[in-house]
Curated annotation (Swiss-Prot):
It comes from Methylobacterium radiotolerans (strain ATCC 27329 / DSM 1819 / JCM 2831 / NBRC 15690 / NCIMB 10815 / 0-1). Keywords: ATP-binding, Cell inner membrane, Cell membrane, Ion transport, Membrane, Nucleotide-binding, Potassium, Potassium transport, Transmembrane, Transmembrane helix, Transport. The chain crosses the membrane at residues 7-29. Part of the high-affinity ATP-driven potassium transport (or Kdp) system, which catalyzes the hydrolysis of ATP coupled with the electrogenic transport of potassium into the cytoplasm. This subunit acts as a catalytic chaperone that increases the ATP-binding affinity of the ATP-hydrolyzing subunit KdpB by the formation of a transient KdpB/KdpC/ATP ternary complex. It is a single-pass membrane protein. GO terms for cellular component: plasma membrane. Belongs to the KdpC family. One of its GO terms (molecular function) is P-type potassium transmembrane transporter activity. This is Potassium-transporting ATPase KdpC subunit. The keyword Translocase does not apply. The keyword Cell inner membrane applies. It holds the Pfam family KdpC. Coiled coil: none annotated. The system is composed of three essential subunits: KdpA, KdpB and KdpC.
Length: 201
């Protein structure tokens, strides 16, 4: 019996060592050598302090900042662990919304968001990504249209001319990946850091 089990045990041990140890360590080392910043999480530092990642959105709410997409992520309810409460951009619980197109709660939330955005910029069409959540709830980017839409509010709050903010948005538009994948986008954290820098001048 041991003679019959030995090949299976040897194969199990070998494959575990190769695929569970050697391969992951090799890929981690290779990624760290070729793409050190990306392998470390694409972290963004300011004055020696990590303030975020270019890959994970943050919940900007102040009038003087550009806002990202709505986030449907949640966290455990402190009062009842069997329930959850909204926790926008909670990276520990990445998820989209389970609300379908016939959901009254979703329709009410979108309607309220559209009305709030229209009050900020009357007469301009509301970009769809400012009222819809992403699949992960952690999307770090918005469309250029969503960024331009927010320029009047940010300009008023920061007392910065709108044309300067529009130029800032234009300078931070990232094109399609490999020229064909995805859509043009603006990283919200990078844009807000640039706004902070502009406001200091």
């Amino acid at each position: 019996m041991l003679k019959q089990l030995r090949p299976a045990l040897v194969l199990l041990t070998a494959l575990t060592a190769i695929t569970g140890l050697a391969y992951p360590l090799a890929m981690t080392g290779l990624a760290g050598a070729i793409f050190p910043a990306k392998a470390a999480g694409s972290l963004i530092e300011r004055d020696g302090t990590v303030i975020g990642s270019s890959l994970i959105g943050q919940n900007f709410t102040g009038a003087g900042y550009f806002h990202g997409r709505p986030s449907a992520t949640t966290a455990p309810d402190p009062a009842d662990a069997s329930k959850t409460v909204p926790a926008p951009y909670n990276a520990a619980n990445s998820s989209g919304s389970n609300l379908g197109p016939t959901s009254a709660a979703l329709a009410e939330r979108v309607k309220a968001d559209v009305e709030a955005l229209k009050s900020e910029n009357p007469g301009a069409p509301v970009p769809v990504d400012l009222v819809t959540t992403s699949g992960s709830g952690l999307d770090p980017d918005i469309s250029p249209e969503a960024a331009y839409f927010q320029v009047p509010r940010v300009a008023k709050a920061r007392n910065i001319p709108q044309d300067k903010l529009r130029d800032l948005v234009t300078a931070r538009i990232e094109g399609r990946t490999l020229g064909v994948l995805g859509e043009p986008r603006v990283n919200v954290l990078a844009l807000n850091l640039a706004v902070d820098d502009l406001a200091r001048r």
